[in-house]
Amino acid sequence: GVSGMSIEDTELPQPFGSVGRTKLLSIPEGVGKMKAALDARQDPNLIIAGRTSAPGVTNMEDALERAMAYEKVGVDAIFLVGVKTKEQLEKISDAISIPIILGGGGSSDMMDLDYLSEKNVRICLQGHQPFSAAVKAIYDTMKALREGTPPEELQGIASAELMKKVTNITDYENMFDKYLK
């Protein structure tokens, strides 16, 4: 099931004609969204992270103000999109005590796992490269098949062992035995 969700302070849906220009809600509106999610939570184990793109959309002072306001209202974590430097991360980390989730890649010197852990970063997403790699692999495979490559000659195919691992074959077999036999 779902164990966590992020509630963002981005103006959604984007108004007509504003493509590429992210706008943020006011801080009081953002706080209201966070409070609504917290009040609606029925499972106390569900993590609610307050998400803001302020580091990349406005400035760090605004991001800091938002992070502190969302922590004060009671979110379980802060999800920041657009933090690019250690200095930016340290400003946030020094100001709040709840876990930090980073979205989007920062500078390479910032991606040290021990450093991130020291700064209370618990999740660090580094973009959509895995999805992009999967799209390219699917495209290349379909193109090769269309051009006549026999399936047994395709390159980059996952081994049977890897397929069993990533598809949780044991869980599947257990459910099959439990429900379908």
Regions found by a protein language model. Name each.
Residues 145-181:
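Flexible C-terminal active-site loop/helix
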Residues 2-128, 132-144, 172, 177-181:
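Alpha/beta enzyme core
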